[in-house]
Amino acid sequence: MTGTAPVSRRQYLGTAGAIIGTTAGCLTGADASIHVLAAGSLTSTIEDHIRPAFEDATDHTLRPEYHGSTTLLQLISDGTKHPDVAISADATLLRTRLFDAHADWALEFASNRLGICYVPSTPLGRRLAAGTPWWRAAVDAAPDTIAVSDPALDPLGYRTLMAFTLAATAHDAPDLRADLDPATVTKPSESQLLADVETGNHAAAVVYENMALDHDLPFLGFPDAYNFAAPERADHYASATYTTDDGTRIHGRPITYATTVLNDASNTAGGRAFVRFLAANPDMVRDAGLAVPESLPTHQGALPDALER
């Protein structure tokens, strides 16, 4: 089957155990290791939830690395890294960068919501906790108060800029994006983004909801007009764009996490077992702070028979 197609959870649940059991029985030691390049926003999701559950259920060992999705896909496309599995926080970006040369299919398995997390004891945090609209409080904040991700390295960064653009329209504040510049400071990685908030270097950060939950920080989700969590607003999101250094224009789109097993994977069977495990356990993914609507999982490209039967 090609193109975008829903795949029922029953299909995954019905055969997940068989595939995991088969691969667990014939792969041990180093051969059972699965190298995963994953979006940085999934660090705690995988380490605290998915990895222990998967390793407990199988003889496989995950070897995850975490990077911004733009960075990890570039590492694969330029031949620097050769993982078994890739997981991107932008499904379209994964297809654009990997299809044809490196992968033939992608499974979309989760969504997320954009917003702002904060330290309640800070001046900005107190205003947010008191109900001041985030954008008014942010404009008034001291310089370098709000950490944001680098748009050149990961989708969180360019979604933040797009959200600021859409927020300007939503709140009838045409200069909002420029007015927010003094208060924001760009960080080179998603891990540093929240580490600097936790250590008190910054009062807040624009993040995905699961990241705030991972770090036990209060989270204010942006409205549907610019949180990239409402599929019915896809056309509206697409009105915001970001242009990369190489001239590629990226349009706003709903947040969707996608994964694939690479064509040159060293452990194809293990990689497929891991992808099936993600699709077959939506409650585990939800417990980690991600959203799994009824529309997921879906896929692009022709799924391997082992994943589609």
UniProtKB/Swiss-Prot annotation:
The UniProt similarity line reads: Belongs to the bacterial solute-binding protein 1 family. WtpA subfamily.
Q: Which PROSITE patterns match?
A: TAT
- Report the PTM annotation: Predicted to be exported by the Tat system. The position of the signal peptide cleavage has not been experimentally proven.
User: Which residues belong to the signal peptide in this entry?
Assistant: 1-32
A GO molecular function assigned to this protein is:
molybdate ion binding
Indicate whether Signal appears among the record's keywords: yes
Q: Which keywords label this protein?
A: Signal
What phylogenetic lineage does the species belong to?
Archaea, Methanobacteriati, Methanobacteriota, Stenosarchaea group, Halobacteria
Record's protein name:
Uncharacterized solute-binding protein VNG_1595C
Residue ranges annotated as coiled coil are none
User: Which is one Pfam family of this protein?
Assistant: SBP_bac_11
- GO:BP terms for this protein? molybdate ion transport
